[in-house]
Amino acid sequence: MIEVKKLVKRFGLKTVLHGLDFEVRQGEFVVLLGPNGAGKTTFLRILASLSRPTFGEVRVAGYRLPANASAVRSWLGVVTHLPLLYGDLTAEENLRFYGRLYGVTNPSSRVTEVLEMVGLASRRRDLVRTYSRGMQQRLAIGRAILHDPEVMLFDEPHTGLDQDACDMLDTLLRDVAGLGRTVVMTSHDLTRVEGLATRFDVLSRGTISASIRREDLGKNDLLGFYREALAG
């Protein structure tokens, strides 16, 4: 579903990604771990066709990027750590707007379905600026799944949320993954993501330094694996 080979990304004289290789099969839930500045967001932006690679090959759903960016976007749902919603519109109006943008068939019915899925049906006619941070993030996920994408990209979705909002978000993330979607998520909160993903990759010094499946963690918890990967 996602295949990356020898990816290099430079900003001027600074190289952020150094020949990175990465592959995700359909239905996998992969969390990219790494310290601040490791290049996680840069990498996700390239997968989302929001940034161009300097060198290397990137394919999503068989389409090569950035040449087929418009085709790939129909396969993708993207959620950043900032919800980026229209605060002076209602939740329903936000989703209807994006439904038209995505060319969603029968948008009214789909908007209702998505609002119920993210637990906001009772607040559908409230202005989004009156929502809590957690509610806005749930609506952002609703927007991302509106066109029923095969691949979901989440960039630090727990950032700025309180404990209750994080718990609700985790439930929603499991629901999204349970529908068979391929998920790639960045995070630095190891405790929060340990029970979510099927695989954990560590991005360090611009490349994937280690990878492990959840069932292979064994007695070594995720924190121990992460520390060893950074020290290696």
Residue ranges and their predicted role:
Residues 187-188:
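H-loop/switch region of ABC-family ATPase nucleotide-binding domains
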Residues 56-67, 72, 210:
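Conserved ABC transporter NBD signature motif
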